[in-house]
Amino acid sequence: MNKVIKIALIGKTNSGKSTLINNIVGEKISIINKKINTTQESLIGIKNYKNIQIIIYDTPGINFLKVSKTFNKNLKVNLWSSIDEADILIYMIDIIRFNYKNIIQDIKKLSEVNKPILLLFNKIDLIDKNEILPKIDLLKDIKNITSFLSISAKKNIGIKKFIKFISSKSYNSKWIYQNNEISNKDDIYITNECTRNAILKFLHKEIPYNIKVKNTLFKYLKNNDLKIKQSIELDNKRYKPIILGKNGNTIKRIRECSQKDIKSIINNNIHLYLQLDTKNAK
């Protein structure tokens, strides 16, 4: 009998959610960048482990739990939708930036949905192991926290244990996704994200995180190479010279970085072409 378990990865920006989901799935499906709230929508990763399908919701930063008119409403809706869908909430903590007060506030808000919460400490490779237990002791009596685990998503420490633990919470059900699916997003979405990630990698201080990349061509050639054309949509004309860079050097670096990432995901030679779209720019 097949089984299913749905989890939502929740945590502060840069706690390591995207790194973890990419590690579990085995492909770079979720954008990784140090720019705040780079996860634009709730991407789903799928891991089939034995007869169990693990469905993982990668959510925007936990800041969107709070009520604020300044936050993007769509991101807030995406976060709460993922929480509603999940069977277990995985609250991920960057153990290097452990903040008791913030954790208590977040858990209190998450407890409103009355679902089991697993506290997952990440980046344990960067601290002394003896520092972990005292932090668990501080939090062990908080309502709805049912378990504690520690990992390093980047160094692949504790990932197998995490997968086994999540699998133990699965229940009998038909699989929601096909055996060969690793995400609810298609190749076009993921390749667009590669380019958006590259833009933020080189220009995170100059360009807004919600910059959009649109696909205009996705075509396999006779030799099985993949030709991709993408349009970078700018809402302000002042971003154009920034992205182009001196003598076009910046956009060249963006293209090369994105092309390399796409090739590593799709395993084909990639011919990537980028253009800047300013028709709706101010």
Question: Where are the model-predicted features located?
Answer:
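Conserved G1/Walker A P-loop phosphate-binding module
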Residues: 1-83, 88, 93, 226, ...
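Canonical P-loop GTPase G-domain recognition
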Residues: 6, 115-116, 125-189
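Conserved glycine(s) of the Walker
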Residues: 16, 158, 250
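Signal for well-folded cores of large energy- and translation-related assemblies
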Residues: 25, 29, 44, 48, ...
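Catalytic P-loop NTPase motifs of RecA-like helicase/translocase cores
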Residues: 39, 63, 99, 127-128, ...
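Conserved C-terminal guanine-recognition region of P-loop GTPase G domains, centered on the G4
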Residues: 47-53, 73-148, 218-222
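A structural signal for isolated positions on well-ordered beta-strands in alpha/beta enzyme cores
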Residues: 55, 118, 271-273
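P-loop NTP-binding site
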Residues: 187-282
